[in-house]
A protein has these predicted regions:
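Conserved kinase catalytic-core segment
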Residues: 131-204
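Conserved ATP-binding subdomain of kinase catalytic cores across diverse folds
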Residues: 1-119
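A broad, structural surface signal
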Residues: 59-67, 155-163, 286, 293
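Short alpha-helical "patches" and their helix-cap loops
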Residues: 75-83, 173-183, 304
Length: 340
């Protein structure tokens, strides 16, 4: 099986700018085989680059996004060639700018406009994000394919949360979800980007050996979203979104269900051996499999529309008029298992 290509970019062309305010050194390269790209080093400290790194995670998540048909930045593995010939491993992402785009707006800015005295610690909630996207009429990104049934930016946000839940992304804060304002004033949600803190990539092999993927997902994969009474995991954040946008949640879960385990394994098998340790690969694949299993269990329980309930009522309960809707829902969950 062919390994993923590793692109070479020159440090002489690297323009370190305001993008370097994150934890990992990065900078723009205006001309590359893929056009304008953002290079990001594999780790914040080069001494940790063998075990804790984000380059392979960005590539894996980029490939998973394609399988989900979720609009996302294209990521490729890359080496930054220093003036002395030293290779600095990292990743490149293709510039998301499109013709007609005016400016990119951090989600935080929209939330501040919608919520008086917005405070990320308390107000960065799934319900607030969805309501803000709806109130501001944020659309889907142009020139990208999405699954049938995904209609607007709020629906795509549900897909972003699904991706984050699958890969245990712990860094989906209100600055790495962006809204793009077009020259005509329209707003659309940006294709997803910045997935480096996923699949346990920041852990050492020693920590991976001492933590089961289940424990990591259930206890340590805490999202940025506020759960009011307690922190919530990425899976819990997606479930909250599913309550508010059940039709969109069903579409994204169906996409997840359509992905075969061998397709996921193929992505990991194509990573060059010097980009990921054996322990990291094993931990990441088991973590992804656990998260996927948990989400597909939830899919079997999700009743997504009143139309489904009406159909089931007519099919199974037309002679039992005394049943209330709540009772129908409980019985319908079991009846819908094979349907969904």
């Amino acid at each position: 099986m062919d390994k993923f290509e590793v692109f070479a970019v020159s440090v002489a062309e690297l323009q370190r700018a305001s993008e370097s305010d994150g934890a990992v050194p990065k900078g723009w390269i205006e001309q590359s085989p893929l056009g304008r790209v953002l290079f990001k080093e594999a780790a914040s400290k080069r001494s940790r680059i063998t075990e804790s790194r984000s380059d392979w995670t960005e590539k894996v998540t980029s490939e998973l996004s394609q399988l989900l048909v979720l609009p996302a930045a294209r990521y490729e593995l890359a080496d930054l060639i220093e003036t002395d010939g030293t290779k600095v491993p990292g990743s490149i992402s293709v510039d998301l700018l499109q013709a007609g785009d005016d400016r990119r707006i951090p989600l935080q800015e929209l939330l501040e406009q919608s919520i008086p005295s917005y405070d990320q610690a308390n107000d960065y909630q799934v319900k607030n994000v969805i309501q803000t996207l709806l109130d501001t009429e944020v659309k889907l990104p142009p020139n990208y394919e999405v699954p049938d049934g995904i209609k607007d930016g709020a629906d795509m946000f549900v897909g972003i949360l699904l991706l984050d839940a699958v890969v245990s992304n712990e860094d989906r804060h209100d600055h790495n979800i962006e809204i793009v304002q077009r020259a005509n004033g329209e707003l659309y949600i940006s294709p997803v980007f910045d997935n480096g803190s996923s699949l346990g990539s920041t852990e050492t092999d020693r920590n991976r050996s001492q933590t089961s993927p289940k424990q990591y997902s259930d206890e340590y994969s805490i999202s940025f979203f506020d759960g009011q009474s307690s922190d919530i995991t990425g899976i819990e954040a997606f479930k909250q979104a599913a309550e508010l946008r059940p039709e969109a949640a069903r579409v994204w879960l169906e996409r997840l269900a359509s992905i075969k385990p061998e397709q996921i394994q193929s992505i990991f098998d194509r990573l060059p051996d010097n980009r990921i340790t054996t322990e990291a690969k094993s931990f990441a694949t088991e973590l992804l499999d656990y998260n996927r299993t948990q989400l597909l269990k939830f899919r079997r329980e999700l009743i997504v529309s009143e139309q489904d309930l009406t159909t089931l009522y007519q099919q199974y309960f037309q002679n039992t008029q005394s049943l209330g809707l709540a009772q129908v829902k409980e019985i319908a969950k079991a009846a819908l298992v094979e349907k969904v």
